[in-house]
């Protein structure tokens, strides 16, 4: 029997949209489920060669994550079909459930996907939250020890039909690391000064019970976003403002002092408004509307900030081709700031667009009845 000190460590190098996203490292529980752990390890190295039955290489390299459900899990391992209907183990097409000693009690666990009892193949999933309803049904056999931020990015990617990512997230390379491999620190600077995980609760650098620790992290991300914006890196600026906003969305402190409550509200307003501004520059209506709506929900929002949020929300609706909602938001903004030239122009643009659309509809209808 193996022990914890000698647990195998394997890795996935993941890419999406033709760009590398980073490395995820797993520790496998071969001291508890040796057969299941060995299956995953060997599929990472590809050492078993081709399958005798299918002729496919028994290897995760080149396969995709085919099913992602936010606040649940990320599933992959179907290297034969890439859709969730295929894959096979190193022992044959399927093998039995080894045991259910380990439970799905935290995020970032590795567990076997299956089609019922004793149908384990090569498909696996990574939990992103505790999933106790899976206990006794799926075999837990490892955990993520490095690259949690990559898993969070994967979890939050755009999805299409059947929860499949719109862009393929590919295991571009995979293999085994030395058993004494030490995970690199989670606080790896991405080149912008951002040392934080994608989700605040995953980050050992942040004490969520200390408001100052949270505020420091959010302020750092916000400042990085501002620098990126000044440098002309608009997409990177949005990414940092949005990340800071995400930290605040996940922060539900109890018994904050009046001073800290004021700081929290000010940070929320600043991050949400900045995210809306940058999303507008990127001409992304949906993201603009979402960020501006978040700003409008902040308690004790002042009129100046409310005006900015309503204007940006209105312009977001215009980008999204919802002119009626755009007009409503901009008219509310104009009531707060009647002399604001940008709001007046925005309303003119909306009314012009509405008139052009209606004229086009009338013309089409007249042709229909002529």
From Swiss-Prot:
This is Peptidyl-prolyl cis-trans isomerase D. GO terms for molecular function: cyclosporin A binding; peptidyl-prolyl cis-trans isomerase activity; ribosome binding; unfolded protein binding. GO terms for biological process: protein refolding. The keyword Isomerase applies. Keywords: Cytoplasm, Isomerase, Repeat, Rotamase, TPR repeat. It is an enzyme of class 5 (isomerase). Its main location: cytoplasm. It comes from the Eukaryota. Belongs to the cyclophilin-type PPIase family. PPIase D subfamily. Its EC number is 5.2.1.8. TPR repeats lie at residues 218-251, 269-302, 307-340. InterPro entries: Cyclophilin-like_dom_sf, Cyclophilin-type_PPIase_CS, Cyclophilin-type_PPIase_dom, TPR-like_helical_dom_sf, TPR_rpt. The gene is CPR6. GO terms for cellular component: cytoplasm; intracellular membrane-bounded organelle. It comes from Debaryomyces hansenii (strain ATCC 36239 / CBS 767 / BCRC 21394 / JCM 1990 / NBRC 0083 / IGC 2968) (Yeast). PPIases accelerate the folding of proteins. It catalyzes the cis-trans isomerization of proline imidic peptide bonds in oligopeptides. The keyword tRNA processing does not apply. It catalyses: [protein]-peptidylproline (omega=180) = [protein]-peptidylproline (omega=0). Residues 11-176 form the PPIase cyclophilin-type domain. It is found in: Cytoplasm.
């Amino acid at each position: 029997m193996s022990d914890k000190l000698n647990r195998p460590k394997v890795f996935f190098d993941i890419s999406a949209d033709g760009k590398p996203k980073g490395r995820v490292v797993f520790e496998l529980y071969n001291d508890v489920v040796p057969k299941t752990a060995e299956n995953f390890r060997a599929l990472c190295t590809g050492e078993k060669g081709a399958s005798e039955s299918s002729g496919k290489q028994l290897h995760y390299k080149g396969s995709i994550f085919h099913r992602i459900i936010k606040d649940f899990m990320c599933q992959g391992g179907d290297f034969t079909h890439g859709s969730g209907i295929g894959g096979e183990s190193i022992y044959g097409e399927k093998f039995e459930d080894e045991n259910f000693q380990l439970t799905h009690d935290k995020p970032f666990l590795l567990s076997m996907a299956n089609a019922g009892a004793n149908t384990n193949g090569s498909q696996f999933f990574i939990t992103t939250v505790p999933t106790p309803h899976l206990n006794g049904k799926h075999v837990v056999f490892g955990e993520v020890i490095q690259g949690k931020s990559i898993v969070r990015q994967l979890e939050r990617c755009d999805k299409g039909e059947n929860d499949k990512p719109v862009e393929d997230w590919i295991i571009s390379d995979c293999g085994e690391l030395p058993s004494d491999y030490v995970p690199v620190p989670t606080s790896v600077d991405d080149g912008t000064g951002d040392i934080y995980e994608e989700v605040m609760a995953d980050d050992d650098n942040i004490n969520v019970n200390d408001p100052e620790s949270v505020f420091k992290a959010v302020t750092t991300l916000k400042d990085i976003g501002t620098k990126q914006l000044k440098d002309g890196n608009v997409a990177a600026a949005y990414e940092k403002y949005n990340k800071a906003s995400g930290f605040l969305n996940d922060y539900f402190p109890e018994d904050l002092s009046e001073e800290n409550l004021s700081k929290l509200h000010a940070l929320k307003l600043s991050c949400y408004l900045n995210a809306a501004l940058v999303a507008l520059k990127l001409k992304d209506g949906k993201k603009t509307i979402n960020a501006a709506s978040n700003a409008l929900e902040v308690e004790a929002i002042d009129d100046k900030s409310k005006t900015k949020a309503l204007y940006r929300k209105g312009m977001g609706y215009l980008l999204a081709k919802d002119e009626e909602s755009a007009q409503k938001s901009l008219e509310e903004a104009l009531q707060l700031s009647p002399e604001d030239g940008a709001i007046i122009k925005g309303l003119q643009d909306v009314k012009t667009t509405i008139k052009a659309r209606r004229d086009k509809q009338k013309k089409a209808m007249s042709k229909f009845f002529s």
